[in-house]
Amino acid sequence: NLLQFNKMIKIMTKKNAFPFYTS
């Protein structure tokens, strides 16, 4: 699910795991 993936990315971004992923 793209929405679940987007949520996961946002959580990872908060943990600074993907600072280049701003979506």
Swiss-Prot record:
User: Where is it mostly found?
Assistant: secreted
Q: Does the keyword Ion transport apply?
A: no
What does the UniProt record tell us about how this protein is modified after translation? Contains 7 disulfide bonds.
Q: Which GO terms describe its molecular function?
A: metal ion binding; phospholipase A2 activity; toxin activity
- Role description: Snake venom phospholipase A2 (PLA2) that shows myotoxic activities. PLA2 catalyzes the calcium-dependent hydrolysis of the 2-acyl groups in 3-sn-phosphoglycerides.
Which family would the database say this protein is a member of? Answer: Belongs to the phospholipase A2 family. Group II subfamily.
Quote the protein name from its UniProt record.
Basic phospholipase A2 Smb-N6
